[in-house]
Amino acid sequence: MRKNFGAMALLITGLVLSHTIEAEAKTNKSPRPNILWIMLEDWGTDLSCYGTQAVHTPHIDQLAAEGVRYTRAFTTAPVCSTSRSAMLTGHYQNYTHTNQHRTQKKHILPYGIEPIPLLLSRAGYCTALGCGLSKKTDQNFTNKLGFTANNWSQRKPSQPFFAQVTEATTHRTWKRDEENPIDENNVELPPYYPDTPLIRRDWANGLEQLQLADKTIGKILQKLDDDGLRDNTLVILIGDNGRCMPRGKQFLYEGGISIPLLMRWPGHIKSETVCNDLVNTLDICKTIIDLAGVEPPHPLHGMNLFSDEIKKRTYIFAARDKMDDTHDAMRAVRSKRYKYIRNLMPERAYCQYNEYKEKRYPTLAVLNVMHQEGTLSPEQSHFMASEKPPEELYDLEADPWETNNLIHETTPQKTVADLRQALQKWQNEMNDEGVTDAFRKGGWPADYPTRSLKAWKEIVEKFHPYVFRMPGEKIRPPDDFIGQTRLLNPKNKSQ
């Protein structure tokens, strides 16, 4: 159902002004905006516009300078399929039962919930997927999404478009940046990693992917300008989840759910705006639907980013469930200062076996070696423990890297109680199943460590040529050891 867009345009203008994202007055005849939604795969806020010194991302920086940069933006899940399922529907993945990554049991969405592109298509938008880049959608449901084109150039005259594109360079198939290689000695590592040459080089290689992605994003934005579409197009740039490094993707720490969020809309969003509100990716869905003048059949879970309501938000929520064949479950609630994590399966290691991570994360191999050698610091060894604490609490102002669990401290107990209550309320509202008996039977929790010290050392050596390859040098990641994995049987740890 279409809303009266003329009234909505004026409403949005007023809300934007109250939100300090200034707008120029628009008449009731103002056309509905085009929407270009760009997703970076598997990377967080390690961009120069967010303060990272070693990386060079001029096109993304320019986008930030021409619009608004959000400093507290989050996904609802720390992995692509569940995060994208939420973004494609405007509803938390646990509410729509799309919360299991790489599930074999995909179903139709609950009654009344329909994909955002389909709603926009029905409202008269040309809905384009890919636009020359990745067409990844990766949803955990069977409904048709409603994309009607491959590029915004296929729209009819005067037809507004919604385009979703994915820049997949940052996914773990990393190339080297031949034009602007990053010196590993210039990067800043999180304190939960040991400072080793291989980890430094792995981190620098990741930052180079952002530089490569930046070049592609620059071409997309230039194409928008060349087509004369800049002024009436809302451009949104986000990450689909956090960085693909240990303690990042697949986990509810900041490294897994904190993402960049930049928006540009000339004449509506004031340039060089920085917003510290708590926002998540569902808010983008709500904003888009409102701007398009669409009334969804089921109320969306997000808030309009241009509303006063969002400034009053106290908490954001995130959840992690099955990752490939790895069974684990965690829930998190975050305020502006604190994060509370509830580990629903604390008896399982953070680093229980996961083929994807063991296959693609050189840093994880180093962590396993040093953990078994006993050479990690306490803040580094926490993530390698054989069990998790049932609860975690972090003061993000004092401890932005989340290395000091305050759950048993006396001072923040009122905060803990409030966060527990908020999380439980959210779980109830989402009809969150938590951990079922069937789910608990999955995975390989007893197989930890997943390999012997000798085996992990051999894997580090195999990763070495790939990680340290020179720009332009063609060396594939060492997949040959994965066939050996499954696993070191606990009775045969000497292998």
Where are these regions (language model features)?
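Extracellular, beta-strand-rich glycan-interacting domains
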Residues: 396-398
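A glycine-rich phosphate-binding loop feature that marks nucleotide/adenosyl-phosphate handling sites
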Residues: 439-444
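Formylglycine-dependent sulfatase
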Residues: 2-391, 400-421, 428, 434-435, ...
